[in-house]
Amino acid sequence: MNINNFNSAEKILRYTGKLDYFYNSHKTLIVTELDLTNKCNHRCPGCCGHNENNAELSKEQIQSIARNLKAMENRGVILSGGGEPTCSPHFEYAVNLLKNAGQSLGLNSHGMNLNEGLNEIIAQNMEYFRISLDAGSAAMYEKIHGMKSAHFAKTLQNIENFARTKQRLGSKTSFGVGFLTSAVTQGDMEAFVRLVKERGADFAQFRPFISDRLDIIPKLNELREKYEDANFKIVASYQKYKEMAGLRENAERGYAKCHGMFFSTVISADFKVWACLHFRQSEKHFLGDLREQSLEQIWRGQRIREVYNAIECAKCPILCRNDSFNRVLENLSLGVTNSEFL
């Protein structure tokens, strides 16, 4: 069972060719977050998608994106939002097209829309699949997702159904259920783990709400000791939780530039490209419109450099999507005395 250890700081160093492009050329893209749609049938109060509009990518636009990603030698696509990916009428079409373009696929979903047809598509094509549950009770689910107890029960059943489909097909998809931690949600952590394990997921994953600094490491260690076994793991964005301790003592990020924006990007459901998933629809972070330019033209153009120089990292969410990339790449850029003496 292969489970993502969420060690982005180590992963970026595996892409030596991309790092060479970073210093010498333009084909730096490794991973792209793709919003198939801005439509969603949940009402999460803290949603980063903000329900900006009801835009949806057409089949023709998805074709163009697949070609663009292949031309840029992009490696992975995360289907996320924006909205809920499975709300797109072209979900299956997009999955097949992107796979044929050589992309490894991951899916982040609220999980409520699943049926057997979707389960099979996901189990046969995704490297990983994460359902965002964020609760161990119906009351917490309503608070975080804005949905009723019947929807919570349906999602729990869908988790169990997908686990069965995965087993039946012999799928290698890494299947987990996510939980965002904060002072509000911490009381549901154990109940969440118990529910997820009982329904057959491979792992439970903990991540902090953006800018939340709650230390859950002691609780996490307790839960791992109590619930982990050969078939079920508890994982977390450890690098973020560990770095939070440092941020509580020192507000310095360790970098002033968003180097990570060259390696990780966002294509939104209105066919536009953005420097950061946290700032979809922010003019300051707008890189280009795929109606007017190819992805390669955007990466070779002046605008991406202007955005890079204009972003003030001190004003960004702490421990953002590109934080770990930025720390590593900042260190690569530092002058080192007597570097020849390892």
Regions found by a protein language model. Give the residues of each.
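N-terminal pre-core extensions flanking Radical SAM catalytic domains
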Residues: M1-N53, K70-A71, G246-R253, F262-S264, ...
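Radical SAM enzyme [4Fe-4S]-AdoMet core and its adjacent flexible, acidic
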Residues: M1-S8, D35, L57-E60, S64, ...
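Short, glycine/acidic-enriched loop or turn micro-motifs at the edges of active sites
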Residues: N38, C87, N113, S137, ...
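Hydrophobic packing within well-folded, soluble alpha/beta domains
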Residues: C40, C44-C47, A94, L98, ...
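Residue-level recognition of short loop/turn positions
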Residues: R43, G82, H110, A269-D270
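Residue-level recognition of beta-strand->loop/alpha-helix junctions
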Residues: C48, G81, S109, F179, ...
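Conserved Radical SAM active-site core
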Residues: N53-N108, M112-Q124
